[in-house]
Amino acid sequence: MNKILGLLFGIGLLIFVCALARAQKSQSGENVDVRGGIDHGEFDRLLKKYVNEQGLVDYGTWKGSASDISALDHYLDQFAAKIDKPTQGNEKAASLVNAYNALVLRWILSNYPTESIWQLKNSFTAKRNDIAGRKVSLDDIEHGTLRPSIGYRAHAVLVCAARSCPPLQRFAYTAENFEEQNDRAYRRWLAREDLNKFLSNERKVEISSIFKWFKADFDKAGGVPKILGRYASQSVREFATSGNYDIKYLPYNWGLNDQGAHGRNYSRVQLIFDNLFK
């Protein structure tokens, strides 16, 4: 009997580990080009209308507005046409960050209500999005383009519709203000005590698993403590910079970043189930 129980436990543990591995986003993709001159004004308006100060989205109301669904589609249409000369630098970065976030929002709106983006098939890997005359995936934008070009800075601004993501900002990124906007997004992310905690009295920080998953990106910029110290609140900045503390990585909540009830009770067990059986 003990051998049977041990075997069943081992099989269960293997299934758990495999499912959890599938639940972690991949880290590969192809480069994506984008044209210059995209107007982000309408996307900025939509973000201000449907995203609150906590970065949660009013998907229910947005889905009920045919005109604002159409407005999001028209915004994304700007990215679709084939181009001869792609843009570069901050214009490319700002446009692709906006494209990623807008495509995630459109994907959720198309499938709402849902409890998590992981309940939807191939959200990150499917080449279903039209940019510069070809089909690209969200992974192409993040891992094939933005991480190689702007490194650790990508991780505060790309929002994959999860409650543990950095908060979705209520503005569209622009070439002219991208550096300042990126800094602002980092500061707001690290100031959220439900997402990152600096416990100086205990010589401990409890931070997002993003800092573990993409450690190589932060190491290229001087390491996690340096980045934490750069953007943490003034009251804990010296402590964060020191690196003289234990690091705990918080469990990632993949529940939908919905202002309503969807995603609030999405569990780690449900995440594993969704990755095994969807």
Report each predicted region and the residues it spans:
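Bacterial N-terminal signal peptides that target proteins for export
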Residues: M1-F9
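Bacterial N-terminal signal peptides
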Residues: L8-F16
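Sec/Tat signal peptide C-region and signal peptidase I cleavage site
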Residues: L20-R22
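Interaction/scaffold regions that mediate signaling and macromolecular assembly across diverse proteins
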Residues: K25-K278
